[in-house]
Amino acid sequence: MNTLPEWTDLRFFLELARAGTLSSAARRLAVEHTTVARRIDRLEAQLGTTLFDRSREGYELTELGAALRPHAEAMEGAALAAAEHVKGADVAAHGVVRLGVPEVFGVRVVAPLMARLLENNPDLSIDLLALPRFANLANREADLGVMLDPPTTGRYMVTRLASFRFYLYAAPAYLARHPPITQQSDLVRHDFVDYVQDRLASSELSYLNELGFTPRRRLCCSGMSGQLEAAALGMGLMMAPPYAVPHDGRLVQVLDGFYAERAFWLVAPADLYRLRRVRLVWDLLRTYADSQPALFQHGPASR
């Protein structure tokens, strides 16, 4: 190899590694798919190795391609940090931050928080990905994300955002039509609203397993927003954290003292964490979660 690879070729390499197909990578880069293919061919020829296995399903990194990826991502992070510094990021955060969050948490907690952040940072923009799953940070779907399962491999900054509890809730009309609930064993006679079990975004969402019996799931939804509406319409009991339940009386807590406890983790790729705009969102989420324990648990924070 007589010359070093061009950074732009490595950028095309990263986008194809993340997207998996030429067309998806081309959309991210705002170029034709033939341009992506040509850049990858040039990079492979320059390095004298095959970086991707090609198939009808798309492009998958070879072993050597996977070995190159963290080096290319480190270069990407350095380029982003350099651009921020040159543009005066030491004075004010600017640019776009893509934040991946669970859907209800994103709508009810994070969106109002981002509105206040943007008022104080006129050069900052937020892409809020409020999803019924967790953002794929490995493919750079988001710059940082809130999730139940922190990554165990790769270069990430990870911190516990908050411990939270799922409590039992039901509509008053449902409770009026069904046998009373005074102890946990009474729950076996009731209907439940839950996630679609073969579409769980995380095994941590199988909290109904902690009931001690197999619940009678009358309606299952892929996201919590659908569950909240179904439970409010009297279709069964559901479990949810305090921040998810509207204070409009449509749902009331059942069986005080029973809950399932989980933790949210805040995660960002290590190279993106260095960016001022990403750290600004990171620090805001950390500070807000610490200051609002009632969003996550009823009563004292410890058992």
Locations of regions flagged by a protein language model:
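C-terminal regulatory
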Residues: N139, P151-F264, D290-R303
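The DNA-contacting recognition helix of HTH DNA-binding domains
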Residues: H33-T34, V107
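A short LG(V/I)-centered, amphipathic sequence patch enriched
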Residues: E44-L61
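Conserved amphipathic alpha-helical core elements
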Residues: L43-E44, L251
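Central regulatory/effector-binding core of bacterial HTH transcription factors
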Residues: H94-G154, R303
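Residues within the DNA-recognition helix of helix-turn-helix
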Residues: E32, R39-R42, L113
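Alpha-helical linker/hinge and terminal dimerization helices associated
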Residues: L10, Q46-L47, L64, L68-D90, ...
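Short helix-boundary/capping micro-motifs
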Residues: E15-A30
